[in-house]
């Protein structure tokens, strides 16, 4: 029983350290973004059918999540942290 408690404590400490490291890396990625990179981008394509591609507004608080966005946030693309791909989630307005 003591061994199980000790292993659980070590696992929790490792998970907490990993979460803190991930939080710092996300802050570094957000700080590296260029000023004005959160502006809207519209691309008009010519052809028989009229079409346009609009990149959603990503202003607000964003975070890189491992799998999916919670209900309080919306999907806003992908981000890379140390070569790993994460889902970018931004707060809803």
UniProtKB/Swiss-Prot annotation:
It is found in: Secreted. Keywords: Antibiotic, Antimicrobial, Defensin, Disulfide bond, Secreted, Signal. InterPro entries: Alpha-defensin (IPR016327), Alpha-defensin_C (IPR006081), Alpha-defensin_N (IPR002366), Beta/alpha-defensin_C (IPR006080). GO terms for cellular component: extracellular matrix; extracellular space. GO terms for biological process: antibacterial humoral response; antimicrobial humoral immune response mediated by antimicrobial peptide; cellular response to lipopolysaccharide; defense response to Gram-negative bacterium; defense response to Gram-positive bacterium; disruption of plasma membrane integrity in another organism; innate immune response in mucosa. It comes from the Eukaryota. Residues 20-59 form a propeptide. Residues 1-19 form the signal peptide. PANTHER family: ALPHA-DEFENSIN 1. This is Corticostatin 1. It comes from Oryctolagus cuniculus.
């Amino acid at each position: 029983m003591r061994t199980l408690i000790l292993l659980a404590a070590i696992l929790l400490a490792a998970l907490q350290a990993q979460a803190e490291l991930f939080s710092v890396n996300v802050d570094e990625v957000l700080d590296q973004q260029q000023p004005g990179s959160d502006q809207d981008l519209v691309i008009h394509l010519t052809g028989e059918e009229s079409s346009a591609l609009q990149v959603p507004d990503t202003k607000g608080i964003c975070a890189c999540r491992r799998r999916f966005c919670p209900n309080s946030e919306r999907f806003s693309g992908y981000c890379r942290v140390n070569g790993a791909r994460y889902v970018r989630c931004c707060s809803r307005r």
